[in-house]
Swiss-Prot record:
A single GO molecular function term of this UniProt record: manganese ion binding
Chain positions recorded as Mn(2+) binding sites: 126, 149, 151, 153, 230, 232
Cofactor annotation: Mn(2+)
Domain of life from the UniProt record: Bacteria
Entry protein name: Agmatinase
Organism: Blochmanniella floridana
Family recorded in the similarity comment: Belongs to the arginase family. Agmatinase subfamily.
Length: 303
C-alpha cells in the first residue's frame, strides 16, 4: 500500500482512500495547498474502551456520503473550489511504541507548519493532541484552544501517556493559555481554578446559540486558536461509537450551529478524536465526525 512518504505500513487499519473522495497525496509538505488532512490511527493511551485507531478509516468512509454535494447546505459554494485540500493518508509508526509515535507525529506537524499548512487530524484517541500542541508551540508560542469534550481531560493518573490528561500536560508545558481558552460540553468533574471558560453541557443545551458564540469569540478574540473536538462531546444517542460515552451531551445540530459561528476566528489547526467504530450504530458517529470536520473546513473559507 502507498503511504505517507511511502513508508512501509504493516498495520491492519490504515486507509486506502481520501476524505471526501479527495486523492491521496503522500508528499504533503511541499504541495501547493491550504489544508492537509492526516489520519492518526492511535489508541494506546485510551483508559476506557479501545478502538479509536480505526477512527480515521471510518470517518473517511462515512465522508463518501458528503462528497456528492457541490455545495454543502447551508453554504452556497463548493469548498473544493475555495480551499486547496489534500489528504496525505495515515501517520505510520511502530505499533505499540508510544514515544516513537509521539516523535513522529510532532515532526510531521512541524514539517507541515514549516511550509505554512493548516491541518485537520482524524484520530485516534485524544492523546494525539499533545504532540500536536507541542509542534504548534514552536511556531506560535502559547496558544488558545477551543475544546469540545464530555471530559475536562486534566485528570492526573500519574501516567505519562493518558488521553484523559492531555489538557493537564499541555498546561504544565505552557502550550496553551487557559484564560483565553474555552471548553464546551463538559459534563464530568472539572475544576474552575484551572482558568478555562467552561460552557458545560447543561448550559449549552439551554442557551441560545448566538449567546454561546458571542461568549466564545469574546474569549478567543483574534488569537491563534486550535480546535480539538472529542466526539464524546456529543450525546451517545447521536454518537455512540466512542470509548467513554457520557449522557446529556450536545446534539449534532447544536454542534454544527456553534461551529458555524467560528468563521472570523483565527483557527490554525483542528483535530477530531475518539471515534471508535466498533461501538457505532449504522455509522452515525463516523458520519457526525465527517460532517463536523467538513463544516469546520467550510468556516475557514475567507471572502
Amino acid at each position: 500500500m502507498c503511504t505517507l512518504m511511502h513508508k512501509h505500513d504493516d498495520s491492519l487499519f490504515s486507509n486506502s482512500f481520501g476524505f471526501l473522495r479527495l486523492p491521496l497525496e503522500f508528499y504533503p509538505y511541499t504541495r501547493h495547498n491550504d489544508w492537509v488532512i492526516t489520519g492518526v490511527p492511535f489508541d494506546i493511551a485510551t483508559s476506557g474502551r479501545s478502538g479509536s485507531r480505526f477512527g480515521p478509516a471510518s470517518i473517511r468512509k462515512a465522508s463518501i456520503n458528503l462528497a456528492w454535494e457541490n455545495c454543502r447546505w447551508p453554504w452556497n459554494f463548493d469548498i473544493r473550489q475555495k480551499l486547496k485540500i489534500i489528504d496525505c493518508g495515515d501517520l505510520i509508526y511502530k505499533s505499540g511504541n508510544v514515544q516513537d509515535f509521539t516523535n513522529i507525529l510532532q515532526k510531521h506537524i512541524e514539517n507541515l507548519l514549516r511550509f505554512r499548512k493548516k491541518i485537520l487530524l482524524l484520530g485516534g484517541d485524544h492523546y494525539i493532541t499533545l504532540p500536536v500542541l507541542r509542534a504548534y508551540s514552536k511556531f506560535f508560542g502559547t496558544i488558545s484552544i477551543i475544546h469540545f469534550d464530555a471530559h475536562a481531560d486534566y485528570y492526573d493518573n500519574n501516567n505519562q501517556y493518558d488521553h484523559g490528561a492531555v489538557i493537564l500536560y499541555a498546561l504544565h508545558e505552557k502550550l496553551i493559555n487557559p484564560n483565553r481558552s474555552v471548553q464546551i460540553g463538559i459534563r464530568t468533574e472539572y475544576d474552575k481554578n484551572f482558568g478555562f471558560t467552561v460552557l458545560d453541557a447543561e448550559y449549552v443545551n439551554t442557551t441560545a446559540v448566538h449567546v454561546l458564540i458571542n461568549q466564545i469569540v469574546s474569549v478567543i478574540q483574534n488569537r491563534p486558536v486550535y480546535l480539538t473536538f472529542d466526539i464524546d462531546c456529543l450525546d451517545p444517542s447521536v454518537a455512540p461509537g466512542t470509548g467513554t460515552p457520557v449522557i446529556g451531551g450536545l446534539t449534532t445540530s447544536c454542534a454544527l450551529q456553534i461551529i458555524r459561528g467560528f468563521q472570523k476566528l483565527n483557527i490554525i489547526g483542528i483535530d477530531i478524536v475518539e471515534v471508535a467504530p466498533v461501538y457505532d450504530c449504522a455509522q452515525i458517529t463516523a458520519l457526525a465526525a465527517a460532517t463536523l470536520g467538513l463544516e469546520m473546513l467550510y468556516t475557514q473559507v475567507k471572502f
